[in-house]
């Protein structure tokens, strides 16, 4: 009598990977337009685009070797949630919107990054 041996399967091999999320050409044009206006005023110096599971990030820097001054995050739509655009500074969420132009309106007012000094 022969016995069949059990086969161990790793679920990770069969699960679909989250689809990489990108900015559309229109969204990228809006972000780069905002970036170029701030560069012309001498406020921003560098930017980075990053893609993570379920999100795309556009980060702007005042100095190249610092943490981003602001990040604009595009999140992937979930079952009951549409795509969202989040403007954040560090861990603080400054604006959440379903459309990029609405999210970027926060930059129409003069924003200034305030950092508390220890003491």
Predicted regions and their residues:
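Negatively charged, low-complexity tracts enriched in Asp/Glu with abundant Ser/Thr
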Residues: 4-56
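Short aromatic-glycine-(Arg/Gly/Cys) micro-motifs in beta-strand/loop hairpins
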Residues: 4-6, 68-91
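Short, charged, intrinsically disordered terminal tails
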Residues: 6-9, 16-21, 105-119
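Short, charged/polar surface micro-motifs in flexible loops or helix N-caps
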Residues: 41, 53-56, 63-68, 78
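Hydrophobic residues embedded in beta-strands of well-ordered beta-sheets
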Residues: 55-58, 85
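A generic structural motif
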Residues: 61-63, 88
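Short, compact, well-ordered microdomains
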Residues: 79-117
């Amino acid at each position: 009598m022969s016995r069949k041996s059990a086969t161990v399967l790793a679920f990770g091999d069969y699960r679909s990977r989250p689809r990489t999320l990108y900015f559309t050409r229109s969204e990228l044009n809006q972000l780069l337009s905002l970036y170029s206006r701030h560069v012309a005023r001498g406020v921003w110096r560098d930017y980075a685009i990053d893609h993570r599971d379920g999100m795309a990030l556009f980060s702007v820097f005042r100095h190249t070797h610092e943490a981003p001054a602001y990040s604009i995050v595009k999140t992937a739509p979930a079952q009951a949630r549409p795509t969202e655009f989040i403007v954040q500074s560090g861990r603080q969420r400054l604006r959440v919107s379903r459309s990029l132009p609405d999210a970027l309106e926060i930059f129409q007012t003069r924003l200034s990054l305030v950092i508390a000094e220890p003491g």
